[in-house]
Amino acid sequence: RANGRYVGDDLERLGRKLIEAVKAVHAAGIVHRDIKPTNVMVSNTGPVLVDFGIAMGEGESHVTRTGLVMGTPGFIAPEIIDGAESDEMSDWWSVASVLAFAATGEPVFGTKPMMAVLERAAAGSANLAGLPAGTMAAFRSALDPDRTKRCTPDELLQAIALDALNPQAWISGNTSD
């Protein structure tokens, strides 16, 4: 870790374990719907996904009775804000946002005002400054507002692992160093 950020091998390990955890949740037929940094507890054995308070099983309605969307700005997928049902792909967008937060040390869509955070997420305007080129490109893809253009969690992890081979890239934010 560097300056509170997860970089290189540390980010790759965090990402791999978090992705494994979310895959297990999805294999059980559950969509978490609220993956954010405060719901990822880091233990000696890796991250633990917590707070399944708004999680839903397959076939359940994913919108509240009043039609309100549940989630945390900056960590809720853009399509959910537009009224789409939560699903595995929206959880994966949230995982990418959490990992980008871990890599940069701050929420990549900002913190306020809330509407501005939602607008930046909807536009795919993540602040990924300082990340190596390959990792940055993979995060841009994983956080794309158009879900059909997003890379898979495994592709994101592969880009992080590749950049982890060059520790200097995480210092300079440029894999060509």
Predicted regions and their residues:
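Eukaryotic protein kinase
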Residues: 1-176
